[in-house]
Amino acid sequence: MKNDVIIIGAGIGGMNAGMQLASQGYSVTILEKRSEPGGKMRRVFHGDCLFDAGPSLITMPFILRDAFAQTGAVLDEYLKLLPIDPICHYRWLDGKQYDCHANPLNRNEETEKVFGRKSMQEMNAYLAHASKVYHATKDVFLFNPFDGFKEFFKRKNLPLLPALPSLKFSSKFHTFNADYFTNPKLIQLFDRFSTYNGSSPYLAPATLMVIPFIEFEYGGWYPEGGIYAIAEAFHKRCLELGVNFIFNADVDEIITDKKTAKGVKTKDGNMYEAKHVISNADVYHAKHDLLKKAHTKKPELSTSGFVMLIPMHKNPFEMSHHTVLFSDAYEREFTTIFKDKESPEEMTVYISVSGKSDPSQVTNDKENWFVLVNTPPTSQANEWSDEKTARYKHSILTMIERFLPDMQSYIADEPFIITPDDFSMEFHATGGSLYGSSSNSMFSAFLRPTNTDPHIQNLHHCGGSAHPGGGIPLVILSGQFAAQSVMAHS
């Protein structure tokens, strides 16, 4: 049977596109390379612990609720979201610690206590500026498809033009942060938000100020049962609406005729015809490998990551759900990643211990430490040898022990390691990049691949490498926009 729509990849973007279309009567089949849905949102059981081995934080929960509501469902019947407070705990090597709260009263109190009244006032002024930018731009850049520079000149977007100077396109994110804050630790804390889409604060535009505003405004959330419960909820709703899933189906080619998508072929030789194809794959992979366009220009890629899933015995460290351990060499860290194309030896470390919020994730009095360090994307296959992996594991553990002395003595089982090579091979992510292209230019927001392919009719894109970008809420929106693109061209 010929499908109305074939979707490549059962990530969150692909599944949202599938359930939106199925709810409107389209016949949809999703082909997934792996044996389960979720894409990078996956779960690993290791050493008496469950780990979310991909995304670890939800912001803008209303996007999740809206996605289900648009199909006639109520999210609360599929998923229970828990607020995380503090959103994140920050530590520096000199012993300074700071809890970031979504509640403005608690945040003001903590900021004044740790950094002083002036810093509290600076933060409030910063967030007020970012709020204006977010509300001026959200309907153009986030909540609708975006088709490049020409979007500015559409009648509906003309009210944005007077606000353009406040967007600070020509300013670097770090420069903007340094103009607002006098305390270098707060500059570093806000600089870190550029890593939410895999970019450098020293290269990315100041428009990224909306990222901390969104987190502070809407809070941090976690679904009971782990982040993977989100993938399970989307999968369940898709099945209820009649979406067909075929797992262990690695798509090898998007079939075209006269520059029109006609279906796909998998590596085992099976052909699937469709009126429309949605690619939830990395956009560069889709163009270079699936469309066989050998001369596709590779974008500047976002960061990849080195992940360790560490089962820990009970310990005295009193970890929060989310913790960031800052290095003292932040600018050098990003120079090493983006200019030298090397993994930094003195690195900032992110640790998520979801068992702190959800005891169901651990057994036998263990703690589940998800440890992530930013790395450059790979430039060739099999770049992470066993020797290189072991050496970097040692470097990261040594760095953690500068904050948490003797931490390694509490490790209960050998860490489960995920390298940039693994991200590349498992998910066809170019160079193991976690977010597709970086935002390391003033025009990066306008150059992100569009949801409607500009060259191949009836081909559409969603996922973290397409508009509007990476992170759970934006990927959900990308699936919605891809579905809208199908409906607009049907």
What kind of region is each of these model predictions?
Residues 55, 464-486:
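A conserved FAD-binding loop/helix module that cradles the flavin
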Residues 164-173, 216-236, 384-392:
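Short beta-strand to alpha-helix junction loop
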Residues 183-197, 346-350, 406-468:
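A glycine-rich dinucleotide-binding beta-alpha-beta segment and adjacent secondary-structure elements
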Residues 2-138:
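N-terminal glycine-rich phosphate/pyrophosphate-binding loop and immediately adjacent elements
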Residues 222, 252-363:
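Mid-domain catalytic core of redox enzymes
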Residues 210-261:
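Helical element adjacent to the flavin cofactor pocket in flavoenzyme catalytic cores
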Residues 314-418:
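C-terminal segments that line or cap access tunnels to active or ligand-binding sites in enzymes
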Residues 93-204:
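Rossmann-like flavin
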